[in-house]
Amino acid sequence: MRKKTSSNKKNTAKKNNNISLHRKLGLIYKKTILILKIVLIIFICLFAFTKYFASLKSYLKTNIYQTTTELGFKLENVIIEGQQNVDEPTILKVLNAKKGSSIFALNLDEIRNNLKNNRWIKEVYVSRRLPSTIYIKLFEREPIAIWQINNQLFLIDEEGYEISKNIEPFPHLLHVVGEGANIYASKLVNELQKYPALINKTSSAIRCGDRRWDLNLKGGINIKLPAKNFEEALKYIDALNKANKLFNQNYKQLDLRDKNKYYIEKY
């Protein structure tokens, strides 16, 4: 009799455990469904209210722009300063606003960013001058040389930045050639500008091994500059030119790479 009683107790305990587990699973399922319903309701509410507020915001903006325009805050004038190589129609196209439209409807940051997409423009300042003027101050890139690389020609600024492929308006600029020539052109141009007579007779500068320059002068003279302190070599060439001992000596090549000994080759 004792054995049967013990067995019955075990069976009863198992049944109770199974019932408890089912209840727990049922509660978890119900809670999960409830949470999902709440999340869904929140998303529906957010979507509905967002659309409502967006619509309200748009309505208010339209009315504010209309009211301020009637009060005289409308676009009548555009003042542009610093403009040299960027034409006015290009700037006004970026402005994308009709005369008489609300001056507050213009997004100044957007105008500024769009203008900076023009490769000529390094920096730009845009502001409203109430009640009716937009002021644009341009800081354009200044071309210092024409860079030839991979059979292509580019106008470059002092940073080596490729401004434009339209080189025709700048035939007077120094022609620099080779890999890295755009990066190092600024220093060479600045030094050559100290000797106007010399730079005017320099047809091109070739970057050699990304470490030094060869100058090709008019008249077929090639000058090999040293990798370091080429300023002294330029002084020497300018002195020869001033003494009239450069272009009438039948020179083919002047090798100035060794500051202690110059080599001269004639035709």
From Swiss-Prot:
Annotated TM spans: 33-53
> In the record, which residues are listed under signal peptide?
none
Periplasmic domain ranges by topology: 54-267
- Membrane as a keyword of this entry, yes or no, is yes
> What is the protein's membrane topology class?
Single-pass type II membrane protein
Record's protein name: Cell division protein FtsQ
Which residue intervals are topologically Cytoplasmic? 1-32
Pfam family example for this protein?
FtsQ_DivIB_C
The cellular location(s) given in this protein's UniProt record come to: Cell inner membrane
Q: PANTHER family this protein is in?
A: CELL DIVISION PROTEIN FTSQ
Family (UniProt):
Belongs to the FtsQ/DivIB family. FtsQ subfamily.
Q: Which domain of life is it from?
A: Bacteria
Keywords in alphabetical order, please. Cell cycle, Cell division, Cell inner membrane, Cell membrane, Membrane, Transmembrane, Transmembrane helix
> What is any one GO biological process for this UniProt entry?
cell septum assembly
Summarize the protein's role.
Essential cell division protein.
Spell out the GO cellular component terms annotated for this protein, sorted alphabetically and separated by semicolons: cell division site; plasma membrane
**Gene name linked to the record:** ftsQ
What are the residue boundaries of the POTRA domain, all occurrences included?
Answer: 73-141
